[in-house]
Amino acid sequence: MEPPVQIFRGEPGPTCSPSTCLPPNGSGWFPGWAEPDGNGSAGSEDVLLEPAHISPVILVIITAVYSVVFVVGLVGNSLVMFVIIRYTKMKTATNIYIFNLALADALVTTTMPFQSTVYLMNSWPFGDVLCKVVISIDYYNMFTSIFTLTMMSVDRYIAVCHPVKALDFRTPLKAKIINICIWILSSSVGISAIVLGGTKVREDMEVIECSLQFPDDDYSWWDLFMKVCVFVFAFVIPVLIIIVCYTLMILRLKSVRLLSGSREKDRNLRRITRLVLVVVAVFVVCWTPIHIFILVEALGSTAHSTAALSSYYFCIALGYTNSSLNPILYAFLDENFKRCFRDFCFPIKMRMERQSTSRVRNTVQDPAYVREVDGVNKPV
């Protein structure tokens, strides 16, 4: 997810600056929009924008999207975590990483109701403590998600290009240890967000905002520093590592017709690699627009128009939508997840199918039956 920075603003006066007109949403705490109250700078001359020019339809659509993300994301990711814990066969190294990704996504979907509320109220009504928690979750999700996807790509690279080393490296235990390390590393940002996050009364607009509170004298510098660090360490470097890993894997897959001694193992290897690639690609597609938007705004090159602000809203919504897409991808692209999902959702039907399959198998293998020349099974 994207980093929290600026959160929510209240009803402006007759006119407002582009930054002030930004939506009062959860995405508002992305470190993408500097406060126009003297603590930050918009990076360019303010262009007055009538509030009426920002259609309320946009806020309604975004709120509806957040509601869908909340339901689908929370239920879907919780189901993913459940099947990995419940079924022994699902406890593979790759699925341990998927569990970590689902945990981060499930956490951030719990913030959707708060963000939707502030979209509609134009102010943060939930207090200082919850403000810190929500901002921290946003940062944790952003860093743990991209770090986990990076490790999944490295894991696939080792499995495809170094199958011998993979026997020692690719174990569920080591995957769990790496997941713990990812959360510890992400805590350097998440805990900082808890310390710096808080509510602030905007007296000029008579509303409460939830944001990272930088020192007034150096607000612009810290705001820019945060945006650049997030862009570099939570996007550029991980994506470059992922690109290198998959480039090497593609070269390997093209040069070798059979990666392992078994065609079945080879199919599974390619299937899992394809699944991870699709998950990574969807993440990059969902998050690239808002990362670019925030970086451009930080450099002071954003066009402060209604179209630009509307694009900003939808870029953020697209990023959060990613948290609800992964369970759907698993269900369509991975047979094991699909089977476990069906087993959980339709236990009676699946039990009857297994019993039917078992009876057919036992009938075929029953020594009381012999196969005649015409191919018909008849009892002896």
UniProtKB/Swiss-Prot annotation:
Record flagged with keyword Ribosomal protein: no
Q: Where is the lipid attached (S-palmitoyl cysteine)?
A: C345
The residues exposed to the Extracellular compartment are 1-57, 120-132, 197-222, 297-311
Residue ranges annotated as Cytoplasmic topological domain: 86-95, 155-173, 248-274, 334-380
- Residues carrying covalently attached carbohydrate according to the record: N25, N39
Q: Which PROSITE patterns match?
A: G_PROTEIN_RECEP_F1_1, G_PROTEIN_RECEP_F1_2
A family per Pfam: 7tm_1
User: Which Cys pairs are S-S linked?
Assistant: C131-C210
Looking up InterPro entries in the UniProt record yields:
GPCR_Rhodpsn (IPR000276), GPCR_Rhodpsn_7TM (IPR017452), Kappa_opi_rcpt (IPR000452), Opioid_rcpt (IPR001418)
| Gene Ontology cellular-component annotations | membrane; neuron projection; plasma membrane
Q: Where are the transmembrane segments?
A: 58-85, 96-119, 133-154, 174-196, 223-247, 275-296, 312-333
User: GO molecular function, one example?
Assistant: G protein-coupled opioid receptor activity
Q: Which residues form a coiled coil?
A: none
Q: What is its main location?
A: membrane
Q: Where in the cell is it found?
A: Cell membrane
A Gene Ontology BP annotation from the UniProt entry: adenylate cyclase-inhibiting opioid receptor signaling pathway
Q: Does the keyword Ubl conjugation apply?
A: no
Give UniProt keywords alphabetically.
Answer: Behavior, Cell membrane, Disulfide bond, G-protein coupled receptor, Glycoprotein, Lipoprotein, Membrane, Palmitate, Receptor, Transducer, Transmembrane, Transmembrane helix
How does the UniProt record describe the way this protein sits in the membrane? Multi-pass membrane protein
Function in brief: G-protein coupled opioid receptor that functions as a receptor for endogenous alpha-neoendorphins and dynorphins, but has low affinity for beta-endorphins. Also functions as a receptor for various synthetic opioids and for the psychoactive diterpene salvinorin A. Ligand binding causes a conformation change that triggers signaling via guanine nucleotide-binding proteins (G proteins) and modulates the activity of down-stream effectors, such as adenylate cyclase. Signaling leads to the inhibition of adenylate cyclase activity.
UniProt similarity note: Belongs to the G-protein coupled receptor 1 family.
**Assembly information from the UniProt record:** Interacts with NHERF1. Interacts with GABARAPL1.
List the protein's name.
Answer: Kappa-type opioid receptor
